[in-house]
Amino acid sequence: RSSDLFVADGGTAANYKGAIGVEGDEVKGCDIVAPRLSFGWTVYKPKEIITVAYVKSLASMVGRTNASAFLSFAAGELLFVGASGSRRAKQDDWELTFKFDASPNVSDITIGDITGISKLGFDYLWVAYEADEDDDAKIVKPQPRQVNVERVYRSADFSPLSINA
């Protein structure tokens, strides 16, 4: 992230410390594409494994993140978004495709003067601001007061998926 600041001759640029779209005491922010990858992993399972209990187990993992390392992704980096499948009559088994979103865990984030922030891939980070007087620029501007990292997805053990990578 970087900023270029431009002011009129004789003016002094305000340091918003990473806040974007500042209007008065409000920070509007901006929409960006978050690092995220969607992928499917196809496996073949014997017909005896695909039971109602197995399907219910899959359903219980939808919308959960990985509680431990899985498919070489660290805990918190995978979100299980579902599965689809069909029976293959000739092979007498099931073809299942597990669907995931991946987003990297991030550490050493700095927002304003707040350092040492870290978040898991699917955590939601938001910032609370307070008014700060900038004597040089002669304005009152928002200053990051607190960074909040919210765990919006529960985690689950993905080992019952029995994916061999």
Give short role names for the model-derived ranges.
Residues 1-165:
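Compositionally biased, intrinsically disordered low-complexity segments enriched in polar/Pro/Gly
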